[in-house]
């Protein structure tokens, strides 16, 4: 007869010996894992090379991560945060179906190249003329699968993904996204405790391109790539990547090469006068090696080579979130973004798998943002916007996959302000508080926000609904709760570590650049 040892037996008994209000039991498909940073990643032009080189940095023994349960703004930029004995940060996982091509594309741009090759091949076959240069051979290595026949060329694979119904998981991934901005040991790090330290890429002084960190669990079964967002003047920061960040923001999220008006210098030559823009020209511009989405291929392929048996996740904030999403769509990897600009526009120009062939709930992409962020909501444009003043053409608003939307304008009474785009603001003032689960809170408040999120974008500065009293909202929605206090007996029983996350929805009926006409004018 098998008799379990003391350690194993204790694991059975601990749940019954703990506090009288234990956390909800996980389902068989749900488990909690911990990570630590193992690498840093980045890319830069080395030795006069024509293409950027991917750089890695293994974790330093002196690398330290910091956590906080108070606003980071309480400290100066150069202040070294103290080591805190905060609760261990956890990520809860679950199983989810993700639709993937049976044959993985070699690169992100393979989708666009395959589409172009097949279109030219089709036109060459059906046009009986001697202009043979219009027809090229179909690529032998990889052909984009047909989304019209998902059963033949696609597989719905059960994958381990972060459980985004769990608030602690949403916060932990947001902190990983925040850590992508700063080098190990810097003042902006959060303590990740049992999480493996990441491998930051591109942190050398001359590394002016894509940056971030790589996290892994103890068994290297799950690896998380975090990618840095924009470091530029519109967000109150800068650094060596600011120039590339601005170029890629304007190329990815503008309607036509950042040609906002006559005073702007376009980032590509696709403008055809009026509100006309060259579609093929735009697609060609996006496959340039200088674009972060393209360089992300090298990063993803290198990580899969280093961890061949691991499940790869991606996360990032702002531009880093959009790049994470584009990589995830290309390779069928789960991605969680924070305050990302609408990346449906560049995804469609790269011919990545999108609805209706790729249902939003099978894409594995989830965007987390709030309604007071003009960048994520797609309203940071026009001559009086801060984005315009800083030279950013942030004109897209539609997101791929599913969206977890926090209606901070209606519920918290926030004004639309580009400063709320910062990841620290999101962690401290949005994610730190539990939002009502289905059936809780003021009736109709959340439903109104979700149903009309894209129509409300143009009037997002509207005052708080008269039917909602601010004090009542604070009581119902738990604003100001920051979790267990450090003093004995100071715990807040109303603060919940798990749950309290809005339900993901797809952004149906969203349209970008409705004034523009795209065709072949160049």
UniProtKB/Swiss-Prot annotation:
The keyword Glycoprotein applies. It catalyses: a triacylglycerol + H2O = a diacylglycerol + a fatty acid + H(+). Keywords: Autophagy, Endoplasmic reticulum, Endosome, Glycoprotein, Golgi apparatus, Hydrolase, Lipid degradation, Lipid metabolism, Membrane, Signal-anchor, Transmembrane, Transmembrane helix. One of its GO terms (cellular component) is endoplasmic reticulum membrane. GO terms for molecular function: phospholipase activity; triacylglycerol lipase activity. Residues 481-506 are annotated as: Disordered. PROSITE patterns: LIPASE_SER. The keyword Nuclease does not apply. It is an enzyme of class 3 (hydrolase). The active site is at 318 (charge relay system). Residues 27-522 are lumenal. Residues 1-5 are cytoplasmic. It is found in: Endoplasmic reticulum membrane; Golgi apparatus membrane; Endosome, Multivesicular body membrane; Prevacuolar compartment membrane. InterPro entries: AB_hydrolase_fold, ATG15_Lipase, Fungal_lipase-type. GO terms for biological process: multivesicular body membrane disassembly; neutral lipid catabolic process; pexophagy; phosphatidylserine catabolic process; piecemeal microautophagy of the nucleus; vacuolar protein processing. It is a single-pass type II membrane protein. Glycans are attached at residues 48, 133, 196, 220, 302, 309, 361. It comes from the Eukaryota. Its EC number is 3.1.1.3. The chain crosses the membrane at residues 6-26. Belongs to the AB hydrolase superfamily. Lipase family. Binds to both phosphatidylinositol (PI) and phosphatidylinositol 3,5-bisphosphate (PIP2). Lipase which is essential for lysis of subvacuolar cytoplasm to vacuole targeted bodies and intravacuolar autophagic bodies. Involved in the lysis of intravacuolar multivesicular body (MVB) vesicles. The intravacuolar membrane disintegration by ATG15 is critical to life span extension. This is Putative lipase ATG15. It comes from Cryptococcus neoformans var. neoformans serotype D (strain JEC21 / ATCC MYA-565). The gene is ATG15.
């Amino acid at each position: 007869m098998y008799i379990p040892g003391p350690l194993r037996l204790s694991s059975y008994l601990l749940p019954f010996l703990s506090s009288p209000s234990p956390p909800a039991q996980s389902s068989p498909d749900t488990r909690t894992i911990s990570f630590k940073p193992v690498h840093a990643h980045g890319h830069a032009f080395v030795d006069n090379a024509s293409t950027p080189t991917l750089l890695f940095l293994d974790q330093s023994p002196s690398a330290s991560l910091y956590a906080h349960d108070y606003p980071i703004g309480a400290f100066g930029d150069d202040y070294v945060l103290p080591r805190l004995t905060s609760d261990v940060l956890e990520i809860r996982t679950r199983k989810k179906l993700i639709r993937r091509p049976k044959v993985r594309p070699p690169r992100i741009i393979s989708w666009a190249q395959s589409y172009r090759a097949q279109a030219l091949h089709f036109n060459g076959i059906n046009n009986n003329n001697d202009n043979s240069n219009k027809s090229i051979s179909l690529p032998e290595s990889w052909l984009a699968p047909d989304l019209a026949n998902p059963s033949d060329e696609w597989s719905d694979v059960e994958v381990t993904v972060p459980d985004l119904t769990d608030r602690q998981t949403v916060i932990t991934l947001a902190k990983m996204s925040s850590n992508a901005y700063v080098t190990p040991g810097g003042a902006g790090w959060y303590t990740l405790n049992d999480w493996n330290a990441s491998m930051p890429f591109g942190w050398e002084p001359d590394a002016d391109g894509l940056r971030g960190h790589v996290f892994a669990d103890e068994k290297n079964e799950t690896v998380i790539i975090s990618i840095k967002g924009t470091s530029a003047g519109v967000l109150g920061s800068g650094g060596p990547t600011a120039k590339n960040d601005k170029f890629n923001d304007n190329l990815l999220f503008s309607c036509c090469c950042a040609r906002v008006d006559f005073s702007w210098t376009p980032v590509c030559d696709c403008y055809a006068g009026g509100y006309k823009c060259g579609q093929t020209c735009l697609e060609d511009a996006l496959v340039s090696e200088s674009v972060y989405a393209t360089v992300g291929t090298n990063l993803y392929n290198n990580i899969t080579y280093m961890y061949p048996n691991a499940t790869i996740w991606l996360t990032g904030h702002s531009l880093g979130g959009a790049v994470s999403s584009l990589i995830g769509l290309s390779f069928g990897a789960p991605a969680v973004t924070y305050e990302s600009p609408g990346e449906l526009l560049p995804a469609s120009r790269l011919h990545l798998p999108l609805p209706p062939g790729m249902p939003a709930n099978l894409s594995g992409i989830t965007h987390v943002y709030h309604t007071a962020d003009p960048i994520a909501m797609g309203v940071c444009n026009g001559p009086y916007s801060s984005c315009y003043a800083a030279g950013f053409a942030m004109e897209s608003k539609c997101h791929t996959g599913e969206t977890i939307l926090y209606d901070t304008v209606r519920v918290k009474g926030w004004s639309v302000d580009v400063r709320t785009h910062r990841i620290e603001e999101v962690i401290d003032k949005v994610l730190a508080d539990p939002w009502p689960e289905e059936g809780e809170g003021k009736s109709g408040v959340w439903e109104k926000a979700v149903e009309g999120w894209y129509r409300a974008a143009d009037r997002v500065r509207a005052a708080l609904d008269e039917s909602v009293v601010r004090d009542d909202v604070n009581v119902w929605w738990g604003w100001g709760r920051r979790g267990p206090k450090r003093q004995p007996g100071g715990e807040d029983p109303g603060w919940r570590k798990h749950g309290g996350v809005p339900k993901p929805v797809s952004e149906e009926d969203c349209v970008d650049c409705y004034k523009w006409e795209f065709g072949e004018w160049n």
